[in-house]
């Protein structure tokens, strides 16, 4: 909060009011479709998979653990870890995606936004290649020259372990 002395200056008061108006408008997302329904948006930098679609449930992998999201879920903001996102549609079908990282936001109005760095449908992945990449990264770990190289290899190991788990 700005000190009261700053608000006495007419120019600053106008600036503060403009900022508050913008923040209030940006903080009010579009309402969900109705009671008991969940509006779901899922996108990557290159593709939109769902745009305000009504879905029954979304299962997400986060740094604090995997969890399922239903309508009226407690609001939360979580960081995604590499893993499987499962979207359960209203008609009972389930679609599975592999995400590398990103964030998921659950709002009080039952709207959910999932923004992922990279997204791939499972049918586009090769279990054999994931296993080979995992073995290669694990063998490179002991020969890492420095901490930066070691951290990079560890990330590759975690991502490929998640890929193998999702595909098995």
From Swiss-Prot:
Entry-annotated residues carrying N6-succinyllysine: 136, 165
Location of the protein in the cell: Mitochondrion; Mitochondrion inner membrane
One annotated GO molecular function: proton-transporting ATP synthase activity, rotational mechanism
One CC-aspect GO term: proton-transporting ATP synthase complex
Protein's UniProt keywords contain Methyltransferase: no
InterPro entries named among the record's database cross-references: ATP_F1_dsu/esu_C_sf, ATP_synth_F1_dsu/esu, ATP_synth_F1_dsu/esu_N, ATPD_C_metazoa, ATPsynth_dsu/esu_N
Residues with N6-acetyllysine modification: 136, 165
Keyword tags: Acetylation, ATP synthesis, CF(1), Hydrogen ion transport, Ion transport, Membrane, Mitochondrion, Mitochondrion inner membrane, Transit peptide, Transport
Transit peptide: 1-22
Main location: mitochondrion
Quaternary state and interactors: Component of the ATP synthase complex composed at least of ATP5F1A/subunit alpha, ATP5F1B/subunit beta, ATP5MC1/subunit c (homooctomer), MT-ATP6/subunit a, MT-ATP8/subunit 8, ATP5ME/subunit e, ATP5MF/subunit f, ATP5MG/subunit g, ATP5MK/subunit k, ATP5MJ/subunit j, ATP5F1C/subunit gamma, ATP5F1D/subunit delta, ATP5F1E/subunit epsilon, ATP5PF/subunit F6, ATP5PB/subunit b, ATP5PD/subunit d, ATP5PO/subunit OSCP.
Family from the record: Belongs to the ATPase epsilon chain family.
NCBIfam families, per the entry: ATP_synt_epsi
Record's protein name: ATP synthase F(1) complex subunit delta, mitochondrial
Gene name linked to the record: Atp5f1d
